[in-house]
A protein has these predicted regions:
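A short acidic/small-residue loop/turn micro-motif
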Residues: 105, 464-466, 526-527
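Short Gly/Pro-enriched turn/cap motifs at secondary-structure boundaries
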Residues: 78, 129-130, 207, 282, ...
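Noncatalytic scaffold domains of N-terminal-nucleophile
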Residues: 25-49, 53, 57-242, 247-299
Length: 634
């Protein structure tokens, strides 16, 4: 074990990669974070500082998580206030895990027919027609009202200071410049982001003070609503909910809808007024003495639980970390779990029958049946969804669709022959060690917070990232999450677009408990790779004995065989990302097994996590060793 630190520790971002040899005992590129009293970790240094400031004010982990959420939504390259927030909260008073569903819904008029009439196969990736109703403001306000201690005024103070002006990071400033063609399509976005119109570089310079007066005015309205309610004798909770009402039913809603519709959006005042945050029961499974909690099937989170159920009977330690057999086992169970995700997951609201078969999907017997079909000699490029209904005593209402389900979407085109293909040992044609997709870093962040009272919060907020379409004079970037719907039942019967429905999303915070007490809190960005990376992080800790920082930095694999949740929803059977330092013999063996290999310098996903050291009564923090992920502990 590493020595405990008695002074506050800070995790600093750096760009480095780790080899695959001897990782269980490897030195890390960043030190582990240690704390006795509290911990705040997220994807941005300024946002982590906002969490630390909130703890110093006397806030609990929920207050700190909300402050970090407000700060990250003010920084735009990961998300905006118009996006969506998903959270798991451990309440030490009840010893229960709580799920927060603050995902927006498709607005009135958003139907398959609407998009087909515009020659679209899916809702668009960007712009006002990509937007569901804003969820993050409601999620933050409900979490704070129900489980926090501080006022909204205190919690929003760091974000409001940032909206007044903060030195913009190079990552966002350069992303604005790259995306300025899109940004110029929307007048409010153009006015906000392109601070040097007509210049060779129209985006802000790195380090330039970036000001958001419209957003500051919106946040001020929320605080004013709270303070007026308090002055009128309302309770703390009711005063915060007065701010909620002002956002979703008051003048903020009016300007949001006006700005959306002016630019071609579909939102109505009724859409915002009817939308509500849901406080839900999470789903869970057990894995060798650990209880692992995820959000319900409106996220992809249960796919990680299905994978754990399939892996539990296997001797992963004997296979060896990132051995050929271990990689193959991971890839195959992920094939199966994500095939089920693509077919069976969707909004479980009673208004959208039939109900998703979550009981069968999470059945251990179903997992054993699925794993029994794994071919240990080759990748199964035709892995399809199973039928979980018999494992919950039911009949599959979509049996006919299941029988016709294609293995890949869209059906793959024959690859052109290449004289070099034999020499590449299964490498994806044209792929190189620096071929990292920009989308890997595009949107979403993760937030982890914990305190000495026992509150633990894990959040995966997203939506409204750059290039964001700003809704009028609110300063709020609208979500892009509607693209995760499909328009036809043949592509996913539970996730077909309907007004008022939530899309099935990739966002997936995670809590693991041991003996009823928090053991790990973890989350990551990365779209369809999120649960792949969290699965491997969890196994790194519980199977291979890595510390939380070692597990965060350790190279993972990523599969692209599942259907993408974005854009054209493409799947690439057999495509696997391996770390560039994966041994040549492992690459050769995997190539012979039918894998299409792409080498990458970064494969672990920017994971942030907290480990609870019960032996010493302390917390260990782990934070990604590339990007801007950052933490503070005390």
């Amino acid at each position: 074990m590493q020595d405990r630190l008695t002074l506050p520790s800070v995790i600093l971002g750096c760009a480095a990669v780790l080899g695959v040899a001897s990782l269980a005992a490897a030195a890390t590129n960043k030190p582990a974070l240690h704390g006795r009293h509290w911990m705040a970790i997220t994807g941005k240094p300024l946002a982590a500082t906002a969490g630390a400031m909130t703890f110093q004010r006397g806030g609990n982990a929920v207050d700190a998580a909300c402050a970090m959420l407000a700060a990250t939504t003010t920084m735009f390259d990961t998300l905006s206030w118009g996006g969506e927030t998903q959270a798991l909260i451990y309440n030490p008073k009840t010893r229960k895990v709580i799920a927060i569903n603050a995902l927006g819904v498709a607005p009135t008029g958003a139907t398959p027919e609407f998009f087909r009439s515009r020659k679209m196969s899916y809702p668009p990736e960007y712009g006002p027609l990509a937007a569901v109703t804003p969820g993050t403001p409601g999620g933050l306000l409900v979490m704070l009202a129900e489980y926090g201690k501080l006022s909204l005024k205190d919690v929003l103070a760091p974000a409001m200071q940032m909206a007044e002006g903060y030195p913009i990071e190079a990552e966002l400033a350069d992303a604005i410049e790259r995306q300025k063609k899109h940004i110029k399509e929307w007048p409010y976005s153009k006015a906000l982001f392109l601070t040097h119109p007509g210049a060779a570089r129209e985006a802000p310079q790195p380090g330039e003070v970036f000001r958001q007066p419209d957003l500051l005015a919106t946040l001020t309205k929320l605080v004013d609503a709270e303070q007026k309610a308090l002055a009128a004798g309302k309770s703390r909770k009711d005063a915060i909910l007065a701010a909620y009402d002002r956002f979703y039913r008051g003048d903020i809603a009016q300007e949001f809808v006006r700005g959306s519709r002016e630019q071609g959006g579909l939102h109505t005042l009724e859409d915002l007024a009817k939308w509500k945050v849901k406080i839900e029961e999470p789903v869970k499974t057990s894995y060798r003495g650990f209880d692992v909690y995820k959000l319900d099937v409106w996220t992809q989170g249960p796919a990680m639980l299905q994978a754990l159920n399939m892996l539990e009977p296997m001797d992963l330690k004997a296979m060896g970390y990132n051995s050929t057999r271990y990689i193959h086992a991971l890839y195959q169970v992920m094939n199966l779990a994500f095939a089920d995700r693509d077919f069976y997951y969707g909004d479980p609201d009673d208004r959208f029958p039939p109900a998703e078969p979550r009981q069968g999907l999470l059945s251990k017997d179903y997992a054993h049946q699925r794993a029994a079909g794994i071919d240990w000699s080759r990748n199964d490029a035709n892995a399809k969804p199973g039928d979980p209904y018999p494992f919950q005593g039911g009949t599959n209402p979509y049996a006919e669709l299941l029988g016709k389900w294609p293995a890949a979407w869209p059906p793959p085109k024959p690859a052109a022959a290449s004289a070099e293909s034999g020499a590449l040992n299964g490498l994806e044609p044209g792929a190189g060690p620096h071929d990292v997709p920009e989308g890997f870093f595009a949107g979403t962040t993760s937030i982890e917070a914990a305190d000495e009272e026992g509150w633990v919060v894990s959040v995966t907020p997203s939506g409204g990232w750059n290039p964001a379409c700003i809704a009028g004079r609110t300063g709020i970037g609208m979500s892009q999450r509607m693209q995760s719907f499909v328009l036809d039942a043949s592509e996913g019967p539970f996730n077909v677009l309907e007004p008022g429905k939530r899309p099935r999303v990739t966002l997936t915070p995670t809590l693991a408990l041991k003996d009823g007490k928090p053991y790990l809190a973890m989350a990551v960005q990365g779209g369809d790779t999120q649960d792949q990376n969290l699965l491997q992080f969890f196994l790194n800790v519980v199977e291979f004995g890595m510390t939380v920082q070692e597990a965060v930095e350790a190279p993972n694999i990523n599969s692209y065989q599942m259907r993408s949740s974005f854009g054209d929803h493409q799947s690439i059977p057999g495509r696997i990302d391996l770390h560039e330092k994966t041994p040549e013999w492992t690459r050769e063996e995997l190539g012979k097994m039918g894998y299409r290999i792409r080498l990458e310098p970064k494969t672990s996903g920017p994971i942030n996590a907290i480990y609870f050291d019960r032996e010493h009564g302390t917390m260990w923090g782990g934070s990604s060793d590339y990007g801007e992920d950052y933490g503070v502990g005390w």
